[in-house]
């Protein structure tokens, strides 16, 4: 069935960062890339506005072809090469955050993550690359920079160069049912976000505070578009919701689960509820004056400073960071409800 340009633009506008239009066009690798990067940080999604006609034409041509081009090498694309390097670094950073505690992380997990990121970009559209050679380049480069986070960059560059040298057109395959494609994409999405969610659940309060601030700042960008903001919130918290549904509350250590619950509330209601939580942390009632907020903050910082609690450093650090975050929230001028500024 021929793909329509108007339908593609509609899906691009409604669910572009989630890759709905690519799913419609049969570009599953591109859809997965957009799911994992939220449309290339939004920039790739916007840039595609002018590329959609060529994507639709390419999808319709593929339906009419009976065999893929043989002996023809796709043209070299600097944009694809740059995207391979960037996504490889991105996958490596995610692995560094979520899997760095693994034994032989710099030998196995890091090059595998970077190589898969490079291969994902290489498989966008009607092109692909050699799986073994690309991963082989990543694994051969990794020991040279063993134990150094900077290893992500040379591994990504080496894998990207190899992927470009081995680039080729995809072989034509019979179309698969949508349910099978969605199942495969869902597994890939969970494989990427699962370790990251687990690390966030079991990591220190510093990581939780950083993630909360990042999510809150990101969601604030969508304050002008409530529906889109709720969609982004749903996507960001989807791994947590799935994990909680499967594991239940018994699957978490109680103290860390309570910390994540606070983070969840922080993100889920990032304006009014965020301030209410900040008041609770500082032990104040809602509507306290700036002087009361500052006084409570100074008193609690003295009590919970890690240098003053050497016998319970971890708990002191958690409270100290919560107090710092709460004070920053309450120090910001409150936006009136319904305001557009």
Curated annotation (Swiss-Prot):
It is a multi-pass membrane protein. This is DnaJ homolog subfamily C member 22. Residues 3-50 form the TM2 domain. GO terms for cellular component: membrane. It is found in: Membrane. The lineage of its organism: Eukaryota, Metazoa, Chordata, Craniata, Vertebrata. It comes from Pongo abelii. InterPro entries: DnaJ_domain, J_dom_sf, TM2. The chain crosses the membrane at residues 5-25, 30-50, 81-101, 105-125, 135-155, 185-205, 218-238.
